[in-house]
Amino acid sequence: MKIVLVGGGKVGTALARQLSEEGHNVTVIDTNKARLEHLSESYDVMGIVGNGSSITTLSEAGIEEADVFIAVTGSDELNLLCCMFAKKAGHCHAIARVRNPSYSHELDFIKKQIGISAIINPEMAAAREISHLLRFPGASKIDTFADGRVRLIKFTLTDAQELDGVAIHEIPTRLKSDILVCAVERAGDVIIPNGNFVLQTGDQVTFLATQEKAHAFFQRIHLAVRPVRNAMIVGGGAIGFYLSQELLENHVRVRIVERDPERCNVLAESLPEAQILCEDGSNREFLLSEGLESTEAFVALTNIDEENVLLTLFAKKHSNGKLVTKINRLEFDDILAGLDLGSIVYPKYMTCDYIVQYVRALQNEAGSNVKTLYRILDDRVEALEFTVHEESRATGVSLSRLHLKKNTLLCCITRGNEIKIPRGGDQIQVGDNVIVVTLEHGLHDLRDIVED
């Protein structure tokens, strides 16, 4: 497909790389010539220097022939304006990143009035992910499928779980747990395991289950399942605001540490039930005096990655609470993974994943399209949910006779209200939603999981 992308920052660069690698014709518009030259040299994309809200620039980029238009500049208003002009000049799907909380209640209205196909708010998505983690603190990462009914959950295996030396096929009978282990990260390698795979202490284990069955499994392996009752949040920006709203609605006591007095006033007016502490979050004595040692969750959400890392390491030293760290830059995720920072949340990854998911869904509207996409375990594994629209070589065949591609696991079938971890005798039917975990990148259709 032909894709026009406005904004060559971190998110724009990640999108340009991913979409070009998947074979799309990508044109990037940005006002920074040096940035575009770097993009064009690094990836198979074309760069155009100019303003994305200029009809002349859009025409030069080929907006009339574009299938998808994406605006991810640093300005919400510019993104919306670019999409509006793109819709007027062409006949494409338009996607805008909009981050300001003041627009949060008007997104549906904006979509209808401008004709935008999708609006992405990465800060709101990040807050929702953190909220899930604080409701299920034993997990280090949680992704949701089937409209929230199915969870993909990651945790670190320690001696306390007593699973060292246990084969995966033993888990259902040994622990009376109906879960499916989908991926394991061990010593830097990622494995899509079979039933004979033996777990070891230190493994990063990702499994799939309904919320109720995940809860029961965590109880049996002695991992925390009780939602946190109080949280200390350092950083009162958009994510801190959205997160506090969600936590307060769930009766969690919230303390926000924010250094900007004006922002503190805004937070105090908007979140009267939260305790707003106007102080520098890097003041260690202050954090300790405000009960860091007894807090059940510590969330570092400042705008500076290095500060968030140091704050979390300090909190880890003084608290046994759930730790969550926000990271903006995508380049150092492999290094951060070795620091044991608790749960790490990347808002920019969420934006990329959503847009790639949307683009893949457009490509296969007839057969089976991608409904949900997550890239997990340092971007090395894709977890996808497909909606099956018509019969294919993947349907009507017992799974035991379906020859899946190497390092691909069919994890779950949802059929109406039924959620099933499939066995060899099960079949995929038209109308099903199917969840797949794979080391393969770029799958667009359910048929892609079957060997030719």
Regions found by a protein language model. Name each.
Residues 1-452:
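Cytosolic regulatory regions of ion transport systems
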